[in-house]
């Protein structure tokens, strides 16, 4: 059997260091380009690590489909590097050729992987994975408790009473998430969905951009991907399983695709394959999201 480990991580995330250590311990060959990857996988019983950002979901899906068509005995694992975003940006700032704008653009484009992309296995590589936070998904919280107990995490706390400054949203970011959490708790006892509602916009705190034009709406480009990445970091400290973390983050990252799934016939089959059996849950989360403005 051929084995491939695809690392998914940001610049300065420590993925190359982790890959080198893993390769030595488990006898893998590290490659960094598609050409090298295909050449190594041509060898029977090959064990290959693909050390690249691999951050864009559509590119991952295309590559996995290509590789599985070519190598029937290929087992593909995804190793997602969950590294604190503050740490990543601080490491970049220390470089002589620092380009923080580039790194932030990569952050906004990076999607957390999911099994539906074609992976046979997924691993979360988190450097502080131990229970340091309580889980509040099954406990009714007041807004004050929600802010204190959930949104106090670094970077996530930037959403507290952050105004949306646009024509679509009346509530602040933190209140929007809180009301979504309250409403979905009345409709389901699915703890992963409730957790997703609690955290679904936490990336808006660092993606908000305003214009010199006082009449222009603020923008939050990339906030869905950033919210998913921050949710992983938060959930790693809740002591729950990787399967639960990936499911919660899947809801956060994909509920906005429901409109496209319902309204774009050309995308329906593609999205059905990606969203799988979670379509109804994603619909519920998006309904709640749209109901609280």
Q: Where are each of the predicted segments found?
A:
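Conserved GTP-binding G-domain of TRAFAC-class P-loop NTPases and closely related GTPase folds
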Residues: 2-8, 13, 87-142
